[in-house]
Amino acid sequence: MGDKAGTRVFKKSSPNCKVTVYLGKRDFVDHLDQVDPVDGVILVDPEYLKDRKVFVTLTCAFRYGREDLDVLGLSFRKDLYISTFQAFPPIAEERKANSRLQERLLKKLGQQAHPFYFTIPQNLPCSVTLQPGPEDTGKACGVDFEIRAFCAKSIEEKIHKRNSVRLVIRKVQYAPEKPGPQPMVETTRSFLMSDRSLHLEASLDKELYYHGEPISVNVHVTNNSTKTVKRLKISVRQYADICLFSTAQYKCPVAQVEADDQVSSSSTFCKVYTLTPTLDKNREKRGLALDGKLKHEDTNLASSTIVKDVTNKEVLGILVSYRVKVKLVISRGGLLSGVLERDVSVELPFVLMHPKPTELPISRPQSAVPDSDPPIDTNLIEFETNSFSQDDDFVFEDFARLRLKGMADDKDDDC
């Protein structure tokens, strides 16, 4: 009997402990044709609720400036999407079939618990954080999704932070099941005062890489020119397209190798170089795109963005892509060579993502659940109940991610 694993449920309470939100997960997957539904339960103290209503909002926002610069009513933030759900009293038109997890939570928490539902539009961006500099304070720039729950007589009522629950969830994408073709590119360059050319061919061993996986770059040079290749530079670059009022692109090297391999005239050269882009070696780079919130144990370089529809760029937020750049540094010769002759380079696009988990939580409608057992004390929300009934077997976990070892706690309590 004893070591049965319970269903993990994340919870967060308002500072005044009168409102608590329960969610089965923090990451919601964009499958390109649909996004996982956001379905949770909100528990409200009836003495605190009185004659008010219970609201839950979902907001997707793009913060493009430091929070400490928000002055004189100017905010460096753009809300890309806002949706409001009235959990109590329920509106008949908004009611949906409860998921199995919601039914189990409602049974466990009692009559003061109410379900809520959100459908995330497919065209919204994934959660991305731009890495702040050492001196930056406040919320980091980037795209995030926030759930906010509170009691009020109307949705327009101003709510104090102490009386509301605010928590951040993530919209994520996983690697496609069928990767694209193997990247390969080639170029030929002719030089001044040389009747023969230099040919560069570069390829990757595959198109899709997982975070932390080494990237093998195959470089083949056929140098029939009179020039000498002095050395090679291979780098992995992250490109972040910021889609706001206009589109701007930022690039940042996340891994690089410089080799003193020379290719003399009338010779060939072939070698495989290995690079591994990771966040560990890039923590000081301001503006680097990362997955989700900063200072969390599960943070890494931002995954590549897969977009199905790019017609409305204003709601795309931040689009992340990666390329490997191979550069041949050519020897200079003659008075005009420095002006007319340039180094030879090519770029290879690839995809960097997390693999799809073997088992993803699925929210399934549940029409009927046995209601013979009485609801247990709602104060008992920190431990697994001794009942071994499947409908009662929960493990509640505070809605906060684990911190990186050796790093200061994140003072933002919205996570």
Curated annotation (Swiss-Prot):
It holds the Pfam family Arrestin_C. InterPro entries: Arrestin, Arrestin-like_C, Arrestin-like_N, Arrestin_C-like, Arrestin_CS, Arrestin_N, Ig_E-set. Belongs to the arrestin family. Keywords: Cytoplasm, Sensory transduction. One of its GO terms (biological process) is positive regulation of ERK1 and ERK2 cascade. This is Arrestin red cell isoform 3. GO terms for molecular function: angiotensin receptor binding. It is found in: Cytoplasm. The lineage of its organism: Eukaryota, Metazoa, Chordata, Craniata, Vertebrata. One of its GO terms (cellular component) is cytoplasm. The keyword Cytoplasm applies.
